[in-house]
């Protein structure tokens, strides 16, 4: 629900404020688990609609043409939000093809090999275009070590 924080507070930085509030409910050794879409996920470049607004390329373009307060973020933006909210450590995992229908989950310690990602990449929750072959692009992203940037979503384990 992090992406909806803009609806729950008038704070200038609603996502950080939301995470700060949640930290008060965590034990000192507790963990916060976040599942969220990556605004730069490959599926959005390939023709999937933004999951929350239903518009093509909405997150990629910075949500400029929407009244929605929903926002998704890149890995770097999420790291900053988490740090600014006062948390210490964030471990990123990469559910594939995304967190709603994961077939595999990767980590920074175990990133996929090309044959790990050779599956059908249908979108079950929305209509989409198929602008290119995602499996072929993933193969190139893996060679260039860019999988994390284009992962469709994140599962994040956050500690104080």
Give the ranges of each region predicted by the language model.
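Conserved class I S-adenosyl-L-methionine
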Residues: 31-58
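Conserved catalytic loop of SAM-dependent methyltransferase domains
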Residues: 89-127
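Short alpha-helix
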Residues: 67-94
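A short glycine-rich, Lys/Arg-flanked "PGG" loop and its adjoining helix->strand segment in the class I
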Residues: 10-33
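Acidic, His- and aromatic-enriched active-site or binding-groove loops in soluble protein domains
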Residues: 55-67, 114-123
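A short SAM/SAH-binding and catalytic strip from SAM-dependent methyltransferases
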Residues: 1-13
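Short, solvent-exposed loop/turn segments at secondary-structure junctions
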Residues: 1-4, 39-41, 87, 95-100
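Conserved Class I S-adenosyl-L-methionine
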Residues: 121-157
């Amino acid at each position: 629900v992090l992406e909806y924080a803009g609806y729950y507070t008038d704070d200038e930085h609603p996502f950080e404020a939301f995470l700060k509030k949640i930290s008060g409910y965590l034990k000192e050794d507790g963990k916060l688990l976040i599942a969220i879409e990556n605004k730069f996920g490959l599926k959005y470049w390939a023709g999937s609609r933004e999951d929350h607004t239903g518009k093509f390329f909405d997150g990629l373009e910075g949500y400029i043409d929407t009244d929605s307060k929903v926002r998704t973020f890149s890995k770097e933006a999420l790291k900053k939000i988490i740090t600014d909210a006062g948390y210490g450590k964030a471990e990123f995992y990469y559910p594939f093809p995304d967190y709603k229908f994961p077939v595999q989950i990767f980590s920074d310690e175990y990133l996929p090999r090309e044959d790990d990602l050779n599956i059908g990449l249908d979108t079950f929750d929305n209509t989409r275009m198929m602008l290119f072959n995602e499996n072929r692009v993933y193969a190139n992203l893996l060679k260039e070590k860019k999988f994390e940037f284009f992962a469709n979503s994140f599962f994040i384990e956050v500690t104080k």
